[in-house]
């Protein structure tokens, strides 16, 4: 065991906290986008993503993803790290980390950091199924999805598994697959899962005929800014050390995000005649998503290019749901699916020393495409099985009357804005 690097430990713990903050950021981002009658339901679904995921992570999620002996390069043995028994030890009655990792910070810090990634990934999904899903079904889905979808895919990509830089796919192509912070594991995975559930549960009542406008755009903007801030932990923290790569990932992340916000705005201006706050917020998230897999391997110029391309493509993609007839309520597929795929594939063009336009050849592009495709198939199949089973047993949706009346009142028994109650209290005081 090496000597503890307290600087690395402090940075990764800070990054874990920043990534944790992203899920409350998503709660505001999505909460502002839904109608007023569904904001509490959306926010409590985000709370469930945090809570259920953390319990599963401690029980067996960490072991499946990172601790257990690899089974075919697909998942780790869930027993090895069950209840974190491989990661924590008691020292005189006080628990501490069992060991240091290769960057000389405690494994317990890794457990914290990676748990926050699992939380934000499943939290992204609920935006697609807003305003119509039972909270109880969502909680069960989170537990099953983290266990059978997220943890194995994280193992495959980030723990030396099938889709990793050292995995069988990379060896077969002769190029190392690269996903710095989650283009496949987080964004493609969440977006495909969201699409599959949407296709199984169907559209909201009134989709395509009624305007579903965001009820609180300032909430959306606040959420976008919190996400931008939290993403510094997401990307720069994925250097797993307080070093120059972390610093550069911070810079490339902001450069791509800024470019995406601007390019989304220009695209929106051409199409609608306006630069909207909703567009700015969505462009910010699109840029953050697209640079995630590539933040450490693209030059400043290519980071800006990736952001600009992603801003345009995601803006255009968000309108496809109306043409194709699927109700992705808050554009999870358009932003995270298209953005994540764009960033993952563009490494094959712009990755330093390996991309077609950056001193490399076609092999990097092939391996990036192949890994993205396998991630899509994995997410679609696993999510499809889970979502279909839930649909045929306990069911996903609230009743039509509950949906029309407002899922907040039906499922939570609360209103976000009790104007009638406030007015009544004021009148009583006046009298």
Which residue stretches match the model-derived regions?
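Glycine- and aromatic-enriched membrane alpha-helices
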Residues: 1-431
